[in-house]
């Protein structure tokens, strides 16, 4: 039974890995082509480019972590190796979440229509707002790295003191739980900001539909379509990131009980977010959608010939 579950999870993980690299790689390729051709990118182009890169790094890091843990275990890694693994995960996870949050703020400022002076002030200074959020989140990143480094220093000290394999594994399980809890704490702020942006955009859509109803105009005007498209992308991000968030909690159980199958399941759940959301971004962005349709048409023509 265990071997069958292991085989199924392995196939799902490989599919997520391939699909995630293809969708994120496609976003990187199209935006790089636009960058070379035009000499610059729009705000959303830069956000999508670095978001896709951070997700590709995150996907590769999760896969490498799984392989290393399943084959060698982390009980005998050096401090340098452990820092490399942990810092890569922290940085890629941080930008994967914060850039998606910045994308939510971008949609809110670009599409929502509020008459409040504060919102209008932020809307007129959209690029500055996005830049401030981007620079501000670096403070969270530095704090996160410092905290993780403290945990690594403490674990390495315990590692050198404990000679037996069982005590080292037990220490690493405790260390892993501390790191996961740290990641959960630092993920709350950007997730909350994205959720608030989503709620405000829903409220903006509701007000817009009321206005359309009073003016006896159709509900499928360009503004309504823009609202719905942005909401579709944002709700998919929130739901998929919720699964990624849950995977953190799921990881606490196998780490505490040292079950490799449980850890594999939590990583499979976690991979679903960076692998799937980029595909939704392709469908929701006109340039990316047109490029994907062109590629599909080209491939179909190639098969016929």
Swiss-Prot record:
InterPro entries: GPCR_Rhodpsn_7TM, TAS2R. It is a multi-pass membrane protein. Keywords: Cell membrane, G-protein coupled receptor, Glycoprotein, Membrane, Receptor, Sensory transduction, Taste, Transducer, Transmembrane, Transmembrane helix. GO terms for cellular component: plasma membrane. PROSITE patterns: G_PROTEIN_RECEP_F1_2. Residues 1-7, 65-88, 150-182, 254-262 are extracellular. Glycans are attached at residue 162. Belongs to the G-protein coupled receptor T2R family. This is Taste receptor type 2 member 13. The gene is Tas2r13.
């Amino acid at each position: 039974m265990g071997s069958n579950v292991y085989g199924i999870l392995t196939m799902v993980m490989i599919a997520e890995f391939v699909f995630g690299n293809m969708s994120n790689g496609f976003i990187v390729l199209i935006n790089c082509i636009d960058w070379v051709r035009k000499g610059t990118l729009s705000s959303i182009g830069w956000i999508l480019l670095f978001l896709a890169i951070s997700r590709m790094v995150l996907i590769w890091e999760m896969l490498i972590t799984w392989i290393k843990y399943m084959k060698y275990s982390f009980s005998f890694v050096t401090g340098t190796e452990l820092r490399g693994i942990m810092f890569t995960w922290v940085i890629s996870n941080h930008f994967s979440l914060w850039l998606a949050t910045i994308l939510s703020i971008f949609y809110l400022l670009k599409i929502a229509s509020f008459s409040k002076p504060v919102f209008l002030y932020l809307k007129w200074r959209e690029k500055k707002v996005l830049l401030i959020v981007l620079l501000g989140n670096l403070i969270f990143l530095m704090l996160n790295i410092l905290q993780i480094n403290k945990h690594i220093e403490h674990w390495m000290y315990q590692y050198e003191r404990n000679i037996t394999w069982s005590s080292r594994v037990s220490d690493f399980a405790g260390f892993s739980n501390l790191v996961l809890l740290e990641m959960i704490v630092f993920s709350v702020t950007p997730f909350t900001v994205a959720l608030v942006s989503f709620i405000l955009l829903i409220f903006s859509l509701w007000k817009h539909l009321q206005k359309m109803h009073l003016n006896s105009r159709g509900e499928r005007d360009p503004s309504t379509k823009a609202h719905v498209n942005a909401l579709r992308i944002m709700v998919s991000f929130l739901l998929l990131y919720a699964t990624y968030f849950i995977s953190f909690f799921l990881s606490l159980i196998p780490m505490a009980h040292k079950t490799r199958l449980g850890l594999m399941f939590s990583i499979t759940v976690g991979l679903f977010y960076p692998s799937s959301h980029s595909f939704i971004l392709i469908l929701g962005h006109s340039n990316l959608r047109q490029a994907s349709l062109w590629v599909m048409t080209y491939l179909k023509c190639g098969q016929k010939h």
